[in-house]
Regions:
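N-terminal catalytic cores of peptidoglycan-degrading enzymes
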Residues: 1-129
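Residues in flexible loops and secondary-structure boundaries
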Residues: 54, 94-97, 144, 180, ...
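A compositional/sequence signature of small-hydrophobic, Ser/Thr/Pro-rich patches
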Residues: 88-90, 228-229, 233-238, 242
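Eukaryotic intrinsically disordered, low-complexity regions
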Residues: 89, 219-222, 241, 257
């Protein structure tokens, strides 16, 4: 059990763990205060939104912030767009977990379970999860896998939360492990992800620490700053394939060499193909003559 992070603390954690985040206006004080407890907190629940979203910020600022006709917002604390951006939607009690299995809650509190959890209670007959869990809504339908960028961000977000509270990966669960009514986060229609695998990945992410490299999107600029004299790494198979090539033993070649070699080999391959085509034409002509002679002789 733990006191929930403050809004300032969660922003600091996101920055510490290298997560690109977007603050929806008003998020820090937007919550369901007066409609139930908030804290002590025990974990983080992964959700899918149930729909593929084209405008992540608009969805976070609209549906997730305001809620639905029968379920007022905020509907989560965090949301993750397809590009891996983390949106801060609300802070405090949020309508995301609903009712769930008290046995699952006990396991999360004690971090004493193994494998996938299978709840026997749901929203109507379970205990209040909104007071105990942070919630992240990952913006995808659940009928297919989330994007790679979303999975990276969700793991790092989880690690950031665990890092602050000193929890293990067993404080991260899927909504479908909390409530018998749910199956998120999904990878196919009606099928929850293998959460033990997710937890293992979260554990590895946390162990790697906040300074571990984070995949970044490719530059959209034509200017990359790379010089022709800069070195580029070659795969280990290259050295294994040509062990006597001294220039490859340091595992790198210059951009100029790489480009020149690529052009040279491509040119040689092109000329080789042209030569083979010419030989095939000659062979076909010779075969036609031979066939004609054999036919006459018969």
């Amino acid at each position: 059990m733990a006191t929930p992070m403050t809004a300032a603390q969660v922003v600091a954690q996101l920055k510490k763990w290298g997560l690109h985040h977007v603050e929806i206006p008003g998020w820090a004080t937007h919550n369901r205060a007066g409609h139930g407890a908030w804290g002590p907190v025990n974990g983080l629940i992964w959700h899918h939104t149930g729909a593929d979203v084209t405008d992540a910020k608009a969805y976070a600022a609209g549906t997730l912030y305001n809620g639905l006709a029968d379920l007022p917002g905020p509907l989560c604390h965090f949301s993750i767009g397809t590009d891996g951006a983390v949106y801060l939607v609300g802070w405090g009690r949020a309508n995301h977990a609903g009712g769930g299995d008290p046995a699952v809650l006990a396991h999360v509190v004690n971090e004493d379970y193994a494998g996938q959890m299978h709840p026997t209670r749901g929203n109507l007959n379970g205990v209040d999860g909104n007071s105990h869990f942070y919630g992240v809504e990952i913006q995808y339908s659940g009928s297919h896998e989330m994007t790679a960028a979303q999975y990276v961000a969700a793991r790092r977000l989880s690690a950031a939360v665990l890092d602050f509270h000193g929890w293990s990966e067993k404080s991260v669960i899927g909504h479908g492990e909390w409530s018998s009514d749910k199956w998120d986060p999904g990878y196919a229609a009606g099928k929850i992800m293998a959460m033990p695998v997710v937890r293992a990945d979260v554990k590895a992410t946390r162990a790697a620490g906040p300074t571990a490299s984070v995949p970044t999107p490719p530059s959209t600029s034509e200017e990359t700053g790379m010089k022709l004299s800069d070195a580029v790494t070659v795969g280990p198979w290259v050295k294994a394939q040509w062990p006597d090539d001294v220039g490859l033993q340091d595992g790198a070649v210059s951009v100029n060499t790489a480009l020149g070699s690529t052009y040279g080999h491509a040119r040689a391959a092109h000329e080789g193909v042209d030569a083979l085509r010419a030989e095939v034409v000659d062979l076909r002509a010779a075969l036609a003559k031979l066939t004609q002679l054999l036919t006459k002789g018969a």
